[in-house]
Amino acid sequence: MELVSIIIAAYNCKDTIYATVESALSQTYKNIEIIICDDSSTDDTWDIINKIKDSRIICIKNNYCKGAAGARNCALKIAKGRYIAFLDSDDYWVTTKISNQIHFMETEKVFFSYSNYYIEKDFVITGVFSSPPEINYGAMLKYCNIACSTVILDRTGVKNISFPYIDKEDYALWLNILSKGIKARNTNLVDTYYRVHAGSVSANKFKELIRQSNVLKSIGIKAHHRIICLFYYAINGLIKHCFSYRDKRNA
């Protein structure tokens, strides 16, 4: 059984971090290490994570705020697992998440996998998002339907994992990986709870479009090509929110 390193970047998340960590500890797949990097929180986050006693947890703290990319990269530097899983500090998993996804990756010979997820708002499940069955670089330029908390990477195929220091850093990393010819595959399971907060950046569609453009510019996509990609991104965003969410009663 290969070691899975679970990376959690935490910043001022005292109300959600306990449930997040507990969902990682409750995995049926037992060969895990959980690396939590507190990004210089100003609330009780650090105290809460240090009260969770389990030998599989490694807690580190940044002396100053480095952002989500910096916190994840600090955790990645000490990760020992063949597999790297990401879990945002306000999301959580079903207990079989890791076990099922590793089985899928080993069986299908996949280096980059992701899954579908529940949408939770104000502690109520409002729907389910189904990601595409497979995503390559060209498709990823036009939309990002991969939630960070659903991803597991195999370091035997994905080398030198590091988040770029830019807004939408997870999307930028996925593009970097896929640009090398690797394809991302969906397990087709719904195993992650993605929490949406009022006023969050990902919920603000105008800001999201600007961030999308900045990522494309940072990787050298020319202006005319960016416009085309952003057009598709906007259309896909509309389709995503109108048609891709299934009512929770049908999940």
Swiss-Prot record:
Keywords assigned: Cell inner membrane, Cell membrane, Glycosyltransferase, Lipopolysaccharide biosynthesis, Magnesium, Manganese, Membrane, Transferase
Pathway membership, UniProt: Bacterial outer membrane biogenesis; lipopolysaccharide biosynthesis
pH dependency: Optimum pH is 6.5.
Residues annotated as signal peptide: none
Alphabetical GO biological process terms: lipopolysaccharide biosynthetic process
Membrane topology: Peripheral membrane protein
Broad class of enzyme this protein falls into: transferase
Any one GO CC term of the record: plasma membrane
MF (Gene Ontology): hexosyltransferase activity
Reactions this protein catalyses: N-acetyl-alpha-D-glucosaminyl-di-trans,octa-cis-undecaprenyl diphosphate + UDP-alpha-D-glucose = beta-D-Glc-(1->3)-alpha-D-GlcNAc-di-trans,octa-cis-undecaprenyl diphosphate + UDP + H(+)
EC number: 2.4.1.305
Cofactors (names): Mn(2+); Mg(2+)
Location within or outside the cell: Cell inner membrane
Chief subcellular location: membrane
InterPro entries: Glyco_trans_2-like, Nucleotide-diphossugar_trans
Superkingdom in the source lineage: Bacteria
Similarity annotation: Belongs to the glycosyltransferase 2 family.
General function of this protein: Catalyzes the addition of Glc, the second sugar moiety of the O56-antigen repeating unit, to GlcNAc-pyrophosphate-undecaprenol.
Protein name: UDP-Glc:alpha-D-GlcNAc-diphosphoundecaprenol beta-1,3-glucosyltransferase WfaP
Organism, as annotated: Escherichia coli
